[in-house]
């Protein structure tokens, strides 16, 4: 398997915007890199959601991508949704530099994330570690601030 590339553009009617590149290497590891601006400083939940449907904004992107029907967790946990990518950190300037490597978000095969949404949340993802009622499903990460659809990128 060769290198596969995809992109997601994050934009909308608020100040949050950005661009993310997804690169799956020949070993099956996908690297997500890019920049998101306009965020409030601090940690923000960062997930792949099941659907690429934005007819109702980011609210129609469905739950976290979870083909193996597991509980929510941290990116390094065995028990986690495939789409659980943890948090991105926005500095005092509201900019988050994203760099995530993961084996559970392939760009090809049965559990491909192509056509699904990447979502940035308003609050910190608790990584399934608190007693909050939403901890094991959403990480209690709050509202969906902005999202983008992951689409195949031309290999030039």
Curated annotation (Swiss-Prot):
What reaction is this protein's catalytic activity?
2 superoxide + 2 H(+) = H2O2 + O2
The note on the cofactor says: Binds 1 copper ion per subunit.
Tell me the first and last residues of the signal peptide.
none
Q: Which cystines does this chain contain?
A: 58-147
Q: Where does Zn(2+) bind?
A: 64, 72, 81, 84
For whether the record's keyword set contains Metal-binding, the answer is yes
GO CC terms: cytoplasm
The entry's function note states: Destroys radicals which are normally produced within the cells and which are toxic to biological systems.
Instruction: Report any Pfam family annotated for this entry.
Output: Sod_Cu
For this chain, the family text in UniProt reads: Belongs to the Cu-Zn superoxide dismutase family.
- Binding, Cu cation: 47, 49, 64, 121
What GO molecular functions are on record for this protein?
Answer: copper ion binding; superoxide dismutase activity
Question: Which cofactor is essential here?
Answer: Cu cation; Zn(2+)
Q: Which UniProt keywords apply?
A: Antioxidant, Copper, Cytoplasm, Disulfide bond, Metal-binding, Oxidoreductase, Zinc
This enzyme's EC code(s): 1.15.1.1
Could you say which enzyme class this protein belongs to?
oxidoreductase
* Protein's recorded name: Superoxide dismutase [Cu-Zn] 2
Q: How does it assemble?
A: Homodimer.
Keyword Metal-binding tagged: yes
Q: Where in the cell is it found?
A: Cytoplasm
């Amino acid at each position: 398997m060769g290198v596969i590339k995809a992109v997601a553009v994050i934009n909308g009617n608020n100040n949050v915007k950005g661009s993310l590149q997804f690169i799956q290497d020949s070993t099956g590891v996908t690297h997500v890199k890019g920049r998101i601006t306009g965020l409030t400083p601090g940690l923000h939940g960062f997930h792949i959601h099941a659907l690429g449907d934005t007819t109702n904004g980011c609210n129609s992107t469905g739950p976290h991508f979870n083909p193996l029907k597991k509980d929510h967790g941290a990116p390094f946990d065995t028990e986690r949704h495939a789409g659980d990518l943890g948090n991105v950190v926005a500095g005092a300037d509201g900019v988050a530099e994203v760099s995530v490597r993961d084996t559970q978000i392939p760009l090809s095969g049965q559990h491909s994330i192509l056509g699904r949404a990447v979502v940035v949340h308003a609050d910190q993802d608790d990584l399934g570690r608190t007693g909050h009622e939403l901890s094991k499903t959403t990480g209690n990460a709050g509202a969906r601030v902005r999202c983008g659809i992951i689409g195949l990128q031309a290999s030039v």
